[in-house]
């Protein structure tokens, strides 16, 4: 239902943010 799709979207956003953070760290070193 609503909660499942909401959690899925939050998970996607968190995954993207984590990926971006890792990429930034790699680029900085």
Curated annotation (Swiss-Prot):
Keywords: Amphibian defense peptide, Antibiotic, Antimicrobial, Secreted. The keyword Secreted applies. Its main location: secreted. Pfam families: DD_K. GO terms for cellular component: extracellular region. It is found in: Secreted. The keyword rRNA processing does not apply. It comes from the Eukaryota. Expressed by the skin glands. InterPro entries: Dermaseptin_dom (IPR022731). One of its GO terms (biological process) is defense response to bacterium. Belongs to the frog skin active peptide (FSAP) family. Dermaseptin subfamily. Has antimicrobial activity. This is Dermaseptin-J9. It comes from Phasmahyla jandaia.
């Amino acid at each position: 239902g609503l909660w499942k799709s909401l959690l899925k979207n939050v998970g996607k956003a968190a995954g993207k943010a984590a990926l971006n953070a890792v990429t930034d760290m790699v680029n900085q070193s």
